[in-house]
Amino acid sequence: MADKILEIRNLKKQFSTGFLLNIDYLYTNRNDIFTLIGPNGSGKSTLIYLINLLLSADSGSIVFDGEDILDKKNNQKKIREKMAVVFQEPILFNTSVYNNLLLGLRLRNIEFSEYKDNFNFLIEKLKLKNLLSRSPKTLSGGEQQKVCLARALLLNPKILLFDEPLANIDQETREEFRGDFFEILKQKGTTTFYITHDRNEAMIISDFVGVIENGTIEQIGPKEEVFRRPVNEKVAKFVGIETLISGIVNNMQNSVIEISVDGSNFIYAVGESIKGKRVMAAIRPEDVIIIAKSEETTSLSTLNIFKGKIKEIKDTGLFKKLEIDCGFSLAAYITDASINRLGLKIGSEIFAAVKASAIHVF
């Protein structure tokens, strides 16, 4: 059974604006990278501030490493010393990088010799050795965040809290930085509570993911489960599932659900449901296979083959995204090479195949 280092129950924080953070239950396993994702203004940063006691909660409990940090009978200063925070904006002081790195040690009256090996490890891994004598003002945004990360990790915190640390860094630096510091986190086994509005980042870095919307946790679980099996429409849309089709369960047989979309279109999915129930079928764009000719569909064993017409072709970077009218709107990813090979353009009539096992029903 996983060892939960952080458990939050019935946590509430009301603001004068009317916004209410209301967390029924949320947890983080020891040594995991947990990422909380949600739109701007959903309460992500507020939760970080509450965990680190930068804000006071109205009610509830935050049990960290066996102690309720909201219980003032506990030594809150000692509990906070087990944590470290890296914010969206780098917080550095007008002195050398070296002095900034040692700030935590000096505030705690700890001898540098106790952490010398860790210091050398971090400046080597994060490529800070040649920056130690410089002022933070002369560093790039990515370099400043690396200094903040090294300072946070120097004291080997029990948990590292990240408040969107890559939000203001360019894409190239973000990818380099992400690779460096998450390699270190995994190597050191540091429990990490990371917040972001970037779902792609969450998919890359996380072990577990939570989705927050309007101050409430909508879903929490292993990242594959959250991204592939969302519990509701809010989560589905936020994790990037654009094709959400409403229908009625028409039949159930051998764990295959037959869903009537409009009486003439049917969708087949693997799962369990109840006949007559209104459900939502979620189809991820990467699970759609595009076929140009009807005769090529005869060799397919998939239950779902939809005839449609391409309404739009959008460039998303690595892929093109097709918007297809199949009697319902269907999104699909496809490469430039496949578009050219199949001779596809706006107005092309095609067939879209989706395995029943790839369709999630809720």
Predicted regions and their residues:
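Conserved ABC ATPase signature
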Residues: 135-139, 143
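Conserved ABC ATPase "signature" region
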Residues: 113-131, 182-183
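Helix-to-loop junction immediately C-terminal to a conserved catalytic motif
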Residues: 52
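Conserved ABC transporter NBD signature motif
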Residues: 60-71, 79, 118
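A short, proline-enriched helix->beta-strand linker immediately N-terminal to the Walker B motif
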Residues: 154-158
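The feature captures the beta-strand-to-loop junction immediately N-terminal to the Walker
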Residues: 37-39
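Glycine/charge-rich catalytic "coupling/switch" loops of P-loop NTPases
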Residues: 264-313, 333-362
